[in-house]
Amino acid sequence: MPFCLTETSLPFGKKYKGKVRDTYDLGDQLILVTTDRQSAFDRCLAAVPYKGQVLNLTSVWWFKNTQSIVPNHLIAVPDPNVAIAKKCKIFPIEFVVRGYISGSTSTSLWTQYQKGVREYCGITFPDGLRKNQKLESPVITPTTKETLHDRPISPHEIVAEGWMTQEDWDETSSYALKLFQHGMEVAQQHGLILVDTKYEFGRDAEGRIVLVDEIHTPDSSRYWLFNGYQERFDAGKEPENIDKEFLRLWFVDHCDPYKDEVLPQAPQELIVTLASRYIQLYEMITGESFVYDSNPGPVNDRILHNIQRWLG
């Protein structure tokens, strides 16, 4: 197995550790390091080779591909695992955009619909929809970014509760739908369906609304294979996907990932399969070949060298 990036320790500003990304604060700029940590159940399950590189470079590809729709926070990419970004004031709302009614978690649109819910996040859904059906047009089902847990919220509540102004909501929601429409079109050209995703927006030092965090990555989005979708849907079968669900299921079968203090180690073949799926998705999404590091070694050393070279 090649070297995995699970922890970073860089001599640049204050460090904030997220589930997957480590962020270093340079004042008006941020160093965003995407690691190979694979998280689920609110904890780190494993380290997946090349995952951080795939997520970072997929996001960078989309940032460049969508800058004519909305400006974004990206400044530079000094290393495959690293993005330098403008520090922005982030809106405390996640913009979840859905093109299909799907999902299996307790908060998913399909789970709520099955329970008889027909109004969700201020949107009214008709009777008679089937799981994995394409919606008449994409919808935004926003959630709040809160300490304990995010909660679904309607646009009216977002403004009434003071999360955002009406003007800011109108502008960001318009951007979100344009980004998703473009993402669906590009994905289809590459043999994929962009099912749903989430966006985050902020305001930069000049007062402009910009896209932040990540865009259309395998972690923030769900993708299905385009070929065969309609036939499988008509037959009542699940769409073919390339995602990490099988790793979650392995842990559920072998332990209680919510309660067990120590988790079993995932089999190496499972990790290799997941790494290859991430790389396959990168190549399908971008239409570009994945470039493997020609000088494998400690990733931290490479990152430090590349950032120092960029900083001059």
Swiss-Prot record:
Q: Which organism is it from?
A: Legionella pneumophila (strain Paris)
InterPro entries given in the database record: SAICAR_synt/ADE2_N (IPR028923), SAICAR_synthetase_CS (IPR018236)
Q: Can you name one GO molecular function term for this protein?
A: ATP binding
Give the E.C. number(s): 6.3.2.6
Q: Name one GO cellular component term.
A: cytoplasm
Report the family membership: Belongs to the SAICAR synthetase family.
> Which reaction(s) are listed as its catalytic activity?
5-amino-1-(5-phospho-D-ribosyl)imidazole-4-carboxylate + L-aspartate + ATP = (2S)-2-[5-amino-1-(5-phospho-beta-D-ribosyl)imidazole-4-carboxamido]succinate + ADP + phosphate + 2 H(+)
| Record-linked HAMAP family | SAICAR_synth
One of this protein's GO BP terms? 'de novo' IMP biosynthetic process
Organism lineage reads as: Bacteria, Pseudomonadati, Pseudomonadota, Gammaproteobacteria, Legionellales
Matching Pfam families: SAICAR_synt (PF01259)
The protein depicted here goes by the name Phosphoribosylaminoimidazole-succinocarboxamide synthase
PROSITE patterns, sorted: SAICAR_SYNTHETASE_1, SAICAR_SYNTHETASE_2
- Keyword Ribonucleoprotein attributed: no
Superkingdom per UniProt: Bacteria
